[in-house]
């Protein structure tokens, strides 16, 4: 199965990001927008792993993030940013990285950069317009994101895009 660890976005924040996507879509840039129902923060992409894979993940105590700001990575990914309790989030990402490594998945070479991918930029068409429109959202605070669990998702591709199915849940437990 093609799988990844993630923190699912809480439902209360989906409409705000859908509104951002709609605003950005208006500039006509070549972007494949992520369905609001599929928005999440990837902790570790595992790629293909055996169906019967089991992972040991022990999330920290529940914590809160703030979903804020919009930007892009290198003309390839449109994102919404996070701030707030980043230490427990980084701990959770490090655990996901270690769990993947124990399963034979190569370690990520780039540092963890907390974000929610809202779209994948396909070409430079109207990229300058997209960046200018993103600047409107740079300081926007979308709301509090209570992190209460991490999830192992299976990613299934279809003609209409990827579909994510929960394989396992790892609740945040206060110690």
Which residues does each PLM region occupy?
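Histidine-dependent nucleotide/RNA phosphoesterase domain, centered on the 2H-phosphoesterase fold
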Residues: 1-175
């Amino acid at each position: 199965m093609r799988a990844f660890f993630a923190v699912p976005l809480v439902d209360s924040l989906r409409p705000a990001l859908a509104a951002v996507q709609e605003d950005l879509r208006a500039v006509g840039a070549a972007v494949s927008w992520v369905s609001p129902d599929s928005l999440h923060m990837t902790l570790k992409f595992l790629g293909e792993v055996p169906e019967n894979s089991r992972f040991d993940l022990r999330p920290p105590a529940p914590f809160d993030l703030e979903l804020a700001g919009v930007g892009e990575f290198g003309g390839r990914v449109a994102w919404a940013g996070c701030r707030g309790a980043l230490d427990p989030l980084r701990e959770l990402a490090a655990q996901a990285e270690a769990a993947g490594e124990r399963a034979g998945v190569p370690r990520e070479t780039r540092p963890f950069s907390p974000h929610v991918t809202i779209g994948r930029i396909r070409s430079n068409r109207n990229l300058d317009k997209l960046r200018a429109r993103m600047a409107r959202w740079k300081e926007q605070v979308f709301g509090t994101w209570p992190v209460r669990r991490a999830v192992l998702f299976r990613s299934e591709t279809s003609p209409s895009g990827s579909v994510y199915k929960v394989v396992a849940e790892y609740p945040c437990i206060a110690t």
